[in-house]
């Protein structure tokens, strides 16, 4: 199932969802019509599986990405002269003063539980043979893929919310919360059971879908964070999954760091293990991160058919962009910085509070509350083709082989085994091609403290350093940030390294250990009396 076919199935499914949501049909009657009397054919087998992925497309940038990156220390969205306050919704994420009514948190809950429901429905149709299968083997492979995808959705949910409802059937009963550790056990068990049945093909027909190596990478991530979830570390279990992926010979690093983020050619990538495919022309939309981060004048630089959102919102925190080592090409491969020109090489100019001045993106932010239209480096990680609309057709990778190598490195460090430096060096090599010797890092160096300058910033200066305790394996934390910033890892990494609720950065100060999880959305609590609010959020 190539990307074009896969996105076609997703677009058809999204259209169907839109039609259903606009009806006023009784749920029982509708279920009876579709599942008991609708004449499914063999042609419905592929779309049934593809449709379960739809929650990823429309639920990423505005919900998952914001809750994972804007809550961390690398990216911030201060207000500016063109707007971007929006009632303080972005600042609440940065300041960690969110509540149960914040829209991004509610949408995160809704989108990923929608994914669970889509998986349960698709599994139900296959298990009951309501949809014909090409063969017994393909039926089992399809069921394995859907169960793995459901496990992925559940991982994201219990990672973000802690105790959550665990539902695996099409029951209409209101569910109670299941303890986080039990949902963790379910996810581990599901993935362990289905991985042997997942397709081994890397890319090609499995592009955008969970194959065996993506399944193992998901399980490795769950094990990597097991101590956070259950109190018991599972480093060796994570190490085992990483070794399986590495030893398979199916996966590898791409020659260039930017290769995973190109608009074309990623389908054959050995590095991208799991991705969200987008296709604007087919209605599979939702990749608008560039629209949010870019200044409106950049339309002339990238020849877009849509105008980016005013002066742009998300931008790099100075404290993070200052950590890059000299010669690391990932700095320019990740961030748009310095003077900007249009597609013909003519200078661009400010149009808001710096109207008429040369458009030059500087790295300095005065604080996390307000910036001028030019302050802060902008998003430059993905290729955005000329002619792109408000959503581009470049895919968003969720899991890359480079993370497998860095997960293994972390497990080796945390179990006092040698070899972490060699793995991290392998990832760094493509970022230091001009000076290969600078790519080399040792095990001992990875055990050093982070180079991040923590503390509250006012008028461009750190005025309150806050907690300055050394970070265990802090250099490895830096390496992960340099490699994965903008990709939705920051919140989870900061929690695992013990700094999410301890450190200060930009205008953020610690707000309590309960911020390790989000509150259950108030609308969900109001709708289901069996749901209890997470501790410290109840009032």
Regions found by a protein language model. Give the residues of each.
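Bacterial N-terminal signal peptides that target proteins for export
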Residues: 2-10
């Amino acid at each position: 199932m190539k990307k074009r076919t896969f996105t076609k199935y997703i677009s058809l499914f999204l259209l169907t969802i839109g039609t259903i949501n606009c009806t006023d049909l009784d749920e029982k009657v509708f279920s009876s019509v579709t599942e008991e009397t609708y004449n499914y054919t063999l042609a419905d087998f592929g779309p049934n599986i593809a449709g379960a992925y739809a929650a990823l497309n429309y639920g990423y940038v505005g919900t998952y990405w914001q809750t994972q990156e804007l809550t961390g220390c690398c990216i911030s969205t201060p207000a500016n002269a063109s707007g971007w306050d929006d009632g303080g919704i972005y600042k609440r994420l940065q300041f960690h003063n969110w509540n149960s009514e914040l829209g991004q948190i509610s949408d995160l809950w809704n989108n990923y539980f929608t994914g669970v429901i889509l998986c349960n429905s698709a599994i139900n149709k296959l298990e009951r043979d309501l949809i014909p299968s090409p063969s017994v083997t393909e039926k089992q492979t399809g069921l394995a893929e859907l169960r793995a995808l459901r496990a992925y959705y559940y991982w994201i949910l219990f990672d973000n919310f802690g105790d959550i409802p665990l539902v695996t059937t099409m029951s209409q009963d209101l569910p109670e919360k299941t303890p986080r550790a039990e949902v963790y056990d379910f996810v581990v068990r599901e993935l362990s059971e289905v991985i042997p049945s997942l397709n081994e093909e890397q890319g090609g027909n499995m592009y955008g879908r969970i194959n065996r190596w993506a399944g193992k990478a998901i399980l490795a991530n769950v094990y990597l964070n097991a101590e956070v979830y259950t109190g018991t570390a599972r480093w060796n279990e994570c190490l085992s999954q990483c070794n399986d992926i590495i030893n398979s010979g199916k996966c590898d690093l791409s020659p260039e760091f930017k290769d995973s983020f190109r608009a074309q050619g990623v389908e054959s990538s050995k590095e991208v293990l799991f991705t969200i495919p987008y296709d604007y022309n087919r209605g599979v939309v939702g990749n608008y991160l560039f629209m949010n981060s870019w200044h409106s004048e950049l339309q002339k630089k990238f020849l877009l058919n849509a105008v980016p959102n005013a002066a742009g919102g998300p931008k790099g925190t100075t404290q993070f962009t200052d950590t890059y080592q000299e010669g690391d090409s990932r700095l320019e491969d990740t961030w748009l910085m310095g003077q900007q020109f249009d597609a013909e090489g003519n200078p661009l100019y400010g149009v808001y509070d710096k109207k008429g001045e040369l458009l030059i993106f500087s790295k300095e932010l005065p604080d996390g509350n307000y910036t001028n239209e030019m302050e802060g480096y902008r998003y430059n990680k993905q290729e955005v083709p000329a002619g792109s609309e408000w959503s581009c057709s470049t895919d968003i990778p969720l899991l890359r082989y480079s993370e497998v190598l860095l997960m293994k490195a972390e497990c080796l460090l945390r179990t006092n085994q040698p070899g972490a430096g060699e793995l991290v060096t392998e990832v760094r090599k493509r970022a230091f091609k001009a000076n290969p010797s600078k790519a080399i890092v040792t095990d001992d160096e990875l055990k050093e403290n982070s180079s991040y300058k923590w503390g509250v910033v006012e008028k461009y200066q750190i005025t309150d350093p806050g907690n300055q305790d050394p970070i265990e394996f802090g250099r490895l934390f830096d390496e992960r940030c340099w490699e994965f910033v903008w990709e939705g890892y920051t919140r989870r990494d900061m929690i695992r390294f013990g700094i999410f609720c301890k450190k200060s950065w930009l205008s953020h100060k610690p707000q309590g250990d309960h911020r390790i999880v989000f509150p259950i959305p108030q609308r969900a609590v109001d709708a289901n009396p069996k749901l209890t609010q997470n501790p410290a959020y109840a009032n």
